[in-house]
């Protein structure tokens, strides 16, 4: 027996997420070969990320004698979620619809300190773009070239600072790709 793909050739791993970058546009394969400016380096909580692209829904078709005749499969539902631990204005603006600035005479003074910012709607906001995930050892990258995200603000959970619970749904880009997997 001749083995053409040995274990050493197959040892390209994605061994945990080190960085999550958000770009505010859909990516194509040709975009990856150019210098890109990431819109945002998201501060994702450790152990706060789930990357499951969905188990396929397989239906087995049987004939009258009980034998499997054929199968049909559909794409499964993805479970891609992460927690972004920041209430910086740029992050708030990304995940919530901005309403009115709270500055100047409208700002609040508590114990001599002045606070200002913005008001937001908590209604779900669709955020479209792409996600680039760098592995811990930077040997591989997973790119979701076209995602739609929704987030909810969690102001306190007892263990973590305030964060956004983000759910991302990968969609095919113009080229038909839902995911791009890259290695060094």
Residue spans of the language-model regions?
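Beta-strand secondary-structure signal
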Residues: 79-83, 130-132, 165-169
């Amino acid at each position: 027996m001749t083995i053409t793909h040995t274990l050493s050739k197959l040892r390209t791993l994605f061994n945990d997420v080190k960085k999550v970058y958000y770009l505010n546009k859909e990516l194509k394969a040709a975009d990856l070969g150019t210098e890109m400016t990431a819109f945002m380096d998201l501060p994702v909580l450790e152990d706060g990320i789930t990357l499951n692209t969905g188990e396929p829904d397989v239906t087995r078709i049987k004939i009258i004698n009980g034998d499997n005749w054929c199968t049909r499969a559909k794409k499964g539902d993805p479970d891609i979620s992460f927690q972004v631990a920041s209430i910086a204005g740029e992050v708030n603006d990304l995940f919530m619809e901005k309403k009115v600035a709270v500055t100047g005479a409208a700002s609040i003074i508590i114990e001599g300190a002045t606070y200002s910012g913005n008001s937001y709607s908590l209604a779900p906001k669709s955020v479209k773009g792409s996600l680039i995930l760098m592995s811990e050892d930077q040997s591989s990258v997973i790119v979701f070239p076209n995602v739609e995200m929704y987030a909810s603000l969690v102001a306190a959970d007892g263990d973590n600072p305030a964060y956004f619970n983000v759910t991302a749904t990968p969609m095919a880009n113009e080229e038909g790709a839902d995911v791009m997997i890259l290695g060094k």
